[in-house]
């Protein structure tokens, strides 16, 4: 069993985790019954873990969303999808490995799946470009979404990216245009679209596959117009102010629910999805099936009109009481 990667704020759990590992080794190597001690330590660790994760700051949630062992797009596909067939290429000479897509079944329903894919180690991350898609990736996604629209297949997208790739080659190939075309065309699609932020949802890279009838996100996922590090560098010329930027950006599920951007926040296991990936998979599958059932009852015109209205309502703001008082005077 691979050792869990602990984040900085999880370090108080290290001693307990070490004790649990030692007792498990003792149980394997001898006939001594240590089940009671093991149960007590595991219960204590679970309680402390829950206390820590119930009090996470936005900056700490970003660390959880970026956790190297957090389930990825392909992990969820393997957990609850049948007959997965990956489709390749944008038909313009590229096949971006940072953004994948293909056909599968969820339960009895055939769907098109698209999503960003990060790597587990340095070699795989380089191959996947750390989940940052280039223009060819977004054009591949659009080609597959057009295919789904033609054959009346619901579209399920998994968002997990720090942002679209911002290198020189991406700009030369039309990164902004590729994302903009996706935004325009996703509003025109006649099939249900459900997007889920499974980890990090960063900037236009997330929005390029995120124009959906329903937007879901996990409890410790984040969805933001810019990374807190980038925001802090722009506003204060100091990336060290990223925690303050994270709080100001309103990137967490509860904040985004209040703003009317997210439709449902999915509960995570104690310690995050990386602690119990199968449980996370069950949660996501149940949510997708529920929302898919509701959306399939709508006509194509209703889907498109509701989708357009949903995004037109975004961007509301509230004035403070003092400002309202000044205006009334």
From Swiss-Prot:
PROSITE patterns: COA_CT_CTER (PS50989). GO terms for cellular component: acetyl-CoA carboxylase complex. Pathway: Lipid metabolism; malonyl-CoA biosynthesis; malonyl-CoA from acetyl-CoA: step 1/1. Its main location: cytoplasm. Residues 40-294 form the CoA carboxyltransferase C-terminal domain. It comes from the Bacteria. HAMAP family: AcetylCoA_CT_alpha (MF_00823). Belongs to the AccA family. NCBIfam families: accA (TIGR00513), AccA_sub (NF041504), PRK05724.1 (NF004344). This is Acetyl-coenzyme A carboxylase carboxyl transferase subunit alpha. It comes from Prochlorococcus marinus (strain NATL2A). The gene is accA.
